Amino acid sequence: MAIGIKVKKAPADYDLGASKFFGTPTVPLAWEGDFYEDEIFLCQIKLADIAKFDRENRLPHTGYLYIFLHTDGGDYDLEADVRYFYGEPELAIDDFNLEVEGYEGFNDAYLMEFCEINDGEACTRLLGVPSDWNYEDTPPKLLLQFDPLDSEMGFLDHLDGFLYFFFGKDENDLESVTLVEEYS
């Protein structure tokens, strides 16, 4: 089972604590100043929003999951910074991506809507198995599959394939999540 993600551009007065790609991240106060200069905000997921679809309880059902990207290597060498916070965020960081060269335009928020889908469906989604896995070995466990052509966000729209965020050996260790760019 996988959790599909559909996105729509957020209205001006949206809830900053909503599940979304880009826009203003809302984070714990303790994280203030805890980001690198080359880091951009990709998404935040309010885990209560996905609880009814995560029947295997692979993710927590409270708090927030965040994905930031280190961009020092450019579009073709991104690195994931995946974080979990168990409570409610207290700090909104406006224009998070504005100072990162090449990513200044990714400040508009795109709200996420979740639905249950088949494991291998080719779209932006959580969990399941990676689409287009062309290798003989068993694929790593998937946290997030991002399909740049699945929306009008414009992020990495030159990538004809997927960004995969794979769990490490321990799904509870989000610091071990790896990012793989896969071209079709």
Go through each PLM region and give its residues:
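Preference for intrinsically disordered or flexible, low-complexity segments
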Residues: 1-184
